[in-house]
Curated annotation (Swiss-Prot):
The gene is dmsD. The keyword Chaperone applies. Belongs to the TorD/DmsD family. DmsD subfamily. Required for biogenesis/assembly of DMSO reductase, but not for the interaction of the DmsA signal peptide with the Tat system. May be part of a chaperone cascade complex that facilitates a folding-maturation pathway for the substrate protein. One of its GO terms (cellular component) is cytoplasm. InterPro entries: DmsD-type (IPR026269), DmsD_chaperone (IPR028611), DMSO/NO3_reduct_chaperone (IPR020945), TorD-like_sf (IPR036411), TorD/DmsD_chaperones (IPR050289). This is Probable Tat proofreading chaperone DmsD. It comes from the Bacteria. Pfam families: Nitrate_red_del. GO terms for biological process: chaperone-mediated protein folding; protein maturation. GO terms for molecular function: signal sequence binding. It comes from Haemophilus influenzae (strain ATCC 51907 / DSM 11121 / KW20 / Rd). Keywords: Chaperone.
Length: 203
């Protein structure tokens, strides 16, 4: 259990930061350096089949030779319509809006347990990057809340979003990041014995 919590702490912060911050943000310097190591995957304590391992490493290597700032802008900022919006309520709300009912439920959870954090521009808290970093925070400080958070507020939609992101062409680095995150979340789910409820997606 302790090893799982440690993994969630490390990988949650690392993956969350890469999804949340722009590539030129100083907070990503060391993380991108990590991914530039030829054998970085040997340090990732998650089991991968050979095909997935090769695909992720090839996409990471190729992606880091591209302009990932442009890719980040296209995927997560705009100004055009985002192909895969990074907020959970977009997929769970019948009207496909941010600040939907699933976000309100997440906010109730945060308020009930007196968890507060500041976002960059008062954006919804159910951003994929923030949710990963919140998982890391809970693993470090409130592990008794972690399973409930993952089961009811995060894993319900995370796989759906990540699978869509993994299919976006010309975004090699973020395609790889999506595949890596899927495998990592699946391992957390197994380790913590989480049964994720089936939900309906509207996008």
């Amino acid at each position: 259990m302790q090893n799982t919590l440690q993994q969630i702490s490390i990988y949650g912060r690392l993956l969350g930061a890469v999804f949340y911050y722009e590539p030129n943000d100083a907070r990503l310097t060391d993380i991108l350096t990590f991914f530039r190591q030829p054998n970085w995957m040997q340090e990732w304590e998650i089991s991968f089949d050979v095909k997935t391992h090769k695909k992720i490493t090839a996409l990471i290597e190729k992606g880091l030779q591209q302009n990932i700032t442009e890719q980040y802008q296209y995927l997560f900022i705009g100004p055009n319509e985002l192909p895969t919006p990074p907020w959970g309520s977009v997929y769970l709300d019948p009207e496909c809006v941010i600040f939907g009912n699933s976000l309100l439920a997440l906010r109730d959870f945060l308020q009930q347990h007196q968890i507060a954090f500041q976002t960059q521009q008062d954006e919804p808290e159910d951003h994929i990057g923030l949710m990963l970093m919140l998982a890391a925070y809970l693993a470090e400080n409130r592990p008794h809340l972690l399973t409930k958070f993952l089961r009811e507020h995060f894993l319900t939609w995370a796989y759906h979003f990540l699978e869509q992101l993994s299919k976006i062409e010309n975004s090699d680095f973020y395609q790889a990041l999506a595949l890596l995150t899927i495998k990592t979340l699946q391992q957390w789910q197994v380790d913590l014995h989480i049964n994720v409820p089936t939900v309906r997606f509207y996008r």
